A protein has these predicted regions:
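N-terminal Rossmann NAD(P)H-binding glycine-rich loop of SDR-like oxidoreductase domains
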Residues: 3-25
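Conserved beta-strand positions in the Rossmann-like core of class I SAM-dependent methyltransferases
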Residues: 4, 28, 47, 160
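Substrate-positioning beta->alpha
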Residues: 91, 144, 162, 190-200, ...
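NAD(P)H-binding glycine-rich loop region in Rossmannoid oxidoreductase-like domains
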Residues: 35-97, 101-104, 203
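Conserved beta-loop-beta element that borders a ligand/cofactor-binding pocket
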Residues: 149-170
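Conserved Rossmann-fold NAD(P)-dependent oxidoreductase catalytic core, especially the SDR/UDP-sugar
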Residues: 26-28, 34, 82, 88, ...
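SDR active-site strand-loop-helix element
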Residues: 6, 30, 70-71, 110-116, ...
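Glycine/proline-rich active-site loop of Rossmann-fold NAD(P)-dependent oxidoreductases
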Residues: 122, 155, 171-176, 202-211
């Protein structure tokens, strides 16, 4: 089975590629800069371009049966007030093209990374996180994830929008916690490694179709 991974050079996207290779998938990746590709495998086909151009997506999507999207709004640093590097509408414009091209190619399965605090989970998050979302440069990031999920909900795709809590780079394996309606109550952190593994694990599953689980670690 071949999958398209978008956002493959990011901190989570790189781990998605590694996990997909471990699980035996053939992979197409769409990247803006080939020089940022950290992997070398015969199972990875590289396409240069951007998801904000549907023609670039068309070539990269051909022959794939599923899409994993690990796009984000990049900031100058992890500080919530730091300057946005990518355009503030990057995720939603990309997702519009992904949905349109998937329809053209009759591709149905898509898994993407959203965020805890989007949609109905906004009432679940701590006050301090809600304040940061409202008054820092996290605001446009969350606005994009809100729009991304609305676009997916209106589509005919078999989508899953994961809502991870705060991401870290820990390598130690912990128990994954999957929550709906704040049950079980999420913890505050999850490793990018765990997010990447879960994204690949559910490619062939329909258990989370049209759902947005919150994921954390216990």
């Amino acid at each position: 089975m071949k999958i398209l991974i978008i956002g493959a050079t990011g901190r989570t996207g790189r781990l998605v590629v590694e996990e997909a290779l471990k699980q035996g998938y053939d992979i197409n990746v769409l990247v803006r800069d080939r020089n940022k590709i950290p992997f070398n495998s015969k199972s990875v086909q590289v396409y240069q371009g951007t998801p904000t151009r549907q023609t670039d997506l068309a070539a990269a999507m051909r022959g794939c049966e599923a899409i994993i999207c690990a796009l984000g709004i990049v900031r100058a640093s992890d500080a919530p007030w730091s300057k946005l590097i990518t355009p503030p509408n990057f995720i939603s414009e990309s997702m519009k093209n992904v949905i349109a091209e998937a329809g053209q190619q009759n591709l149905k399965r898509l898994i993407t990374v959203s965020a805890w605090g989007v949609g109905e989970t906004k009432k679940e998050i701590p006050f301090w996180l809600r304040w940061l979302i409202n008054y820092t440069n996290l605001r446009p990031v969350y606005a994009e994830h809100e729009l991304e999920e609305k676009l997916l909900s209106a589509s005919s795709l078999r989508w899953t929008a994961l809502r991870p809590v705060a991401l870290n780079d820990a390598k130690k394996k912990k128990t994954l916690k999957i929550s709906f309606n704040n049950f079980p109550k999420p913890s505050l952190q999850i490793s990018r490694q765990s997010v990447a593994k879960f994204m690949v694990d559910i490619v062939k599953s329909d258990k989370y179709d049209m759902k947005s689980p919150t994921i954390s670690e216990s």
